[in-house]
Amino acid sequence: MKENVPSTVVFILLLFLNISLLNGQSPPGKPEIFKCRSPEKETFTCWWKPGADGGLPTNYTLTYHKEGETFTHECPDYKTGGPNSCYFNKKHTSIWTIYIITVNATNQMGSSSSDPRYVDVTYIVEPDPPVNLTLELKKPEDQKPYLWIKWLPPTLVDVRSGWLTLQYEIRLQPEKTAEWETHFAGQQTQFKILSLYPGQKYLVQVRCKPDHGFWSEWSPESSIQIPNDFSMKDTTMWIFVAILSAVVCLIMIWAVALKGYSMVACILPPVPGPKIKGFDTHLLEKGKSEELLSALGCQDFPPTSDCEDLLVEFLEVDDSEDQQLMPAHSKEHPSQGRKPTHLDPDSDSGRGSCDSPSLLSEKCDEPRANPPKFHTPEGIEKPGDPETNLPRPQDPQSTSVESKLLYFHADGSKSSTWPLPQPPILHDPGSSYHNLADVGQLVLGTAGATAALLEKTDRHAFNPPKTTETGGEGRATEQKESESFHSKTDQGTVWLLPQDKGPFVSPKPMEYVEIHKVSKDGALALLPKQQENGDRPEKAGAPETSKEYAQVSRVMDNHILVLVQDPRARNVAPFEEPTKETPPSRPQNPAAKDLASFTTAPGHCRHPLGGLDYLDPAGFMHSFQ
């Protein structure tokens, strides 16, 4: 029994030893490549961390291959870079080429590999720290004192050829503080530090970085002691300026707080109110421009209307006392052939020229209908006898009978008449205007007129004078007959005016009549048109002025004027025509005899000019076409 005990203990001890040996041995762990660095972009080195060795000796190898290749290479140098590193010299380094690197670990129990690492030499550049760092305190006379720092690039980097470009950064701190003050210096190898505290010791370091890569390590520290007598005059001056500015700002704020309203009113004065008399600010605020303009006395825009809306149904009058007579008829055509020796100045003021004949013709082309008749009013004054009649020579070659001319009276203002377009059958294109005597030739009686009046009118209108009496005696006889004629007519009698020849058949141009003025009593003053008398001389004894007048007895419904003789026409010295040989009377135009009335369209042939209407006797003949 005692002999079996030692063998059992040895077995148990061997069993526990075998178990412990079996638990300590295993395959190696997975290694890790943690850094690859190139100090000058010509060579590079990679470092790795080994994994667990498994209790057995482990062997590490680094293999690589370039991108696009299948052949695998092993690390060319395991010693230059230190333990667990691989150094690639210039022969094995290529830029713009990607390296695929792997680390393998192997022992008796097995092997393991690291994750592949892709390396481009251009982007793994990490240069060495700058060298020869020096510090110097300078005190120039014209500038404030400063700390001058200088250094040199790393020895392995070729910066002269431009193969690698470095940027620098400086940091410094007082010895008794923990914070660093950093300054970027760029590509220069010197730098100035201005803000320094006297009596302090400063520690300075510098580092560098390429265009593509990483910052280098900080260079070894360099220190400098700032003396206590270090001048700070510039800083003291700026401090004084800052304090003074703060005091001035406080004073201004205090003044604005006390007298803010008055200062604002002084800097930004208020807009003065309107000082226009009668100006209402409330209307301006409400936006009522019409009431505002009316309050200021301004006129609004004139209303727009058609041409006929502006017609005015009255004539312009004045208080002139001049009386003029109509000229006697010529041998060729009524109102032609004799030039008046003297005429008053025309007061038409140019209104007639504003209406073109073409414009009037457009308005007068519409046909007239239902022509009204002229009626003589009751109580017509009898004309008086003329004072004197001056004879004038008669043209022996005359082919027409001298027209009988009535004497009219008026003391109103003068107004010009515009012509209306004439029918092409009745007159020559050269004829344009007619006097009042021609209008009288158109106003003929109808079948409703009394027989006695018709016979009397026909006698005066168509029968030539049988004797060669002087113009004065014939005129007196005419006036006497007219006086008896007016005394016999009543209000319902149709007026018949004499006519010597067919209406407007003369080839020569005709004249127009100017209405001089119309008085309050309805009297109408007429002015003849002054014309040249080239084919008939005047008698030496003719007066200088030739005037005839008519009196408006009444105005009918359609604005038709009824003209009567003026009893006061005898007091004016008229001019008389001499007796002349009268050719045998020729038959009157049947169309002129049958026409007994005419029509006028009120406001149809008028055009407003300054508030006046123009009366054109030529418009009376439009219905005789």
Swiss-Prot record:
Disulphide connectivity of cysteines: C36-C46, C75-C86
Positions on the Extracellular side per record topology: 25-237
Renumbered residue ranges of the record's region Disordered: 325-423, 455-492, 524-548, 571-601
Localization terms from the record: Membrane
Box 1 motif (motif): residue ranges: 267-275
Any single Pfam family the record assigns to this protein: EpoR_lig-bind
Major location category of this protein: membrane
Glycan attachment residues as annotated in the record: N59, N104, N132
Membrane topology qualifier: Single-pass type I membrane protein
Domain Fibronectin type-III span(s) in chain numbering: 27-128, 129-229
Protein keywords: Disulfide bond, Glycoprotein, Membrane, Metal-binding, Receptor, Repeat, Signal, Transmembrane, Transmembrane helix, Zinc
Gene Ontology terms, MF aspect: cytokine binding; metal ion binding; peptide hormone binding; prolactin receptor activity
Assembly information from the UniProt record: Interacts with SMARCA1. Interacts with NEK3 and VAV2 and this interaction is prolactin-dependent.
Purpose of the protein: This is a receptor for the anterior pituitary hormone prolactin.
Protein name as catalogued: Prolactin receptor
Gene: PRLR
